Amino acid sequence: MGIITCSNVTKKFGDFTALNKVSIDIPKGEIFGLLGPNGAGKTTLIRIINQISLPDGGEVFFDGKPLTPGAVESIGYLPEERGLYKKMKVGEQAIYLAKLKGMSAAQATKELKEWFVKFKIQGWWDKKVEELSKGMAQKVQFITTVMHKPKLLILDEPFSGFDPVNVSLIRSEILRLKAEGTTIILSTHNMESVEELCDNIALINKSNLILSGNVDEIRRKYGNNQKEIIYKGQVPLNISNAPVKVVSDEPFKGNRRAVVEVVSDATNAQILSELIKDTEIVSYQELIPRMSDIFIKLVSNN
């Protein structure tokens, strides 16, 4: 059993079913992608895990035990809609939020000062939140989310509003936290981040779980047995004797790039042995679909 296990979780709002018997298991120490289009039910599930809302059916377990309000101290939650108090000073507010998570003022001050040095924001301590830019405020909220060293960290669109430099900074911190044993739920529409960061994912659409599993295994499963061939020449690829059909063939950086689909059980060695008779091959590799393509395909067909 993972750090979070949801078994047949159902949530209704009147006649509307927001979650319909959703079952997922989130392994410890991993980055787990919680995916789905707007309105799919992701936020409802996050609110249930955070004890903000209760399920109408099913069970939720935290670290092998039924989820209780006391588990919240072991969870850090960064919502998509940020919520710092604009009139409070940054340091004062951060200490207040840390105390809500069970830290003493002394512990919080020590931890915060280390984070402020790491993020190079020492001069922000006495600033009011309303004086900060959106990106600056998001840095502060990220710190307040992680400073109590939660077992489980839930990040809802954590890179939203950040410039590339700060995206890289936050991504590095997420990977460091994972390396230290923190389990992270990443809720995002950015499929590039999913491919880069996530070990496993769950895809929810229209209140139902429609896909779950390891990211690399899912990408291979939804492949079309296609290969990418970069080759020298100015004319289209000669495939008269190769067991493939051409999907596309076009100029590419001084060479040509062809995408072919294997139409038999031929091995890569057999395919290449036919191609190299008439063509100088620069590169040959399996073409694995992007998570964005899989997301669009499944959500559109569901």
Which positions does each model-derived feature cover?
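Short, Lys/Arg-enriched, disordered terminal segments
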Residues: 1-4, 300-302
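ABC transporter nucleotide-binding domains
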Residues: 2-4, 11-205, 211
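Residue-level recognition of well-ordered beta-strand positions that form the cores
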Residues: 7, 25, 230-232
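Alpha-helix N-cap/helix-start and coil->helix boundary motif
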Residues: 10, 68, 91, 184, ...
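Solvent-exposed polar/charged
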Residues: 145, 195-196, 220, 277, ...
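ABC transporter nucleotide-binding domain
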Residues: 172-260
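Short, charged/small-residue-rich alpha-helical element at the C-terminal edge
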Residues: 226-302
